[in-house]
Amino acid sequence: MGSVASCLEGVLDMIQGRLGNALARLQAAFPAQASGSAEKILAGRPSLEITLSIALYETDALDEVEQLLGEVLPHAKESSPPDSLISAHVLLARVALLKGDRDAWLRLLADLEQIGQQAGSARVICSAWLERARAATLENRLESARQALRYAELHADWERPGILLHGNDVDTPSITRFRLHIAQGDCQDTERDLRQAMAEANARQHHRRELKLRLLHALALNALERSEEAFEALSEALRFASHEGFMRTFLDEGPRLGSLLQRWAVLHQAQSRALGIEPRFLTTLLQRFVGHGEAPTPGQAPGAVGEGLTTREIQVIRLLAAGHRNKVIAEKMFLSEFTVKSHLRNINAKLGAQGRTEAVAIARARGLLD
């Protein structure tokens, strides 16, 4: 029964936004379940591993998640409750899509939908369609997203105020609808509804959900050209997430949030510690947005692929960040001043910067100066 208790406590930790506690609790319980095949299946191990996978996924430990869920999914199909089945299939599908395996993504969601149909579970069926709608929205396939959301809403009577089902903590019909409305530019009412949803989540201590809603709220404010309010919302989200390690909550919102985060970083990254934001978390998050292809270079439209800086251009921007003028940079790199100026023009064009100071700020936000 120890693994069942650890699993339930880990679920509560996740709902309340205590990712660090959840990881520590679940990882401590996991080795105790590593022996005894009967206990693995009968004493809650599939649910324990799936709950641990949710926590690991939030830290962007995708390989560990893939390994854990790949091992446990056959047992989960036989013995796990709907929340575990939903989480296992959706997380594995997302990891597959992130790694470029769209066929596996399609297959896992089809499997989940079939399980829901066989079990007569509207929520399981709905969850498969919610994930399809989420992916289509992020890929800017908005008509496909609308259609997937319509199918999800046919099975959405389980979403009620005050009821939280942990397999759908941050993936509900309303959250999916908010995301789609923002992508469509329908943000006036959405911004108001997000404020109300955040207040309700906060009152119930559903802080993981509140974090997701806050990021969507920042995107809605940004779309309404209320940039300062959007940056304030993002600062608050980063302040909370950086001390718990919530990484994928940000990354899963794709290029639109990545672009907003990089604009925020140009203005505020240097003051991150004073804002109560853990600098190492912020640097890692910015790098992973770029590394996963989930953030455009500043100055480009979301979804565009930026041209990377060459090794020589990175040397130039680092010397510039160190405070050196063109003449000194030329001497240190054995170049002419004309060549240095040419490199700086290329750097500004690639980073979407208007001048030297902004180029350095953007390079720092992208982790190029580390």
Predicted regions located by residue number:
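Intrinsically disordered or compositionally simple regulatory linkers and C-terminal tails
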Residues: 261, 266-307, 311-312
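Helix-turn-helix DNA-binding segment
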Residues: 296-350, 354, 360-370
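Amphipathic alpha-helical segments of tetratricopeptide repeats
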Residues: 24-38, 70-81, 109-121, 150-163, ...
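Repeat-solenoid scaffold signature
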Residues: 114-119, 123-138, 201-204, 209-244
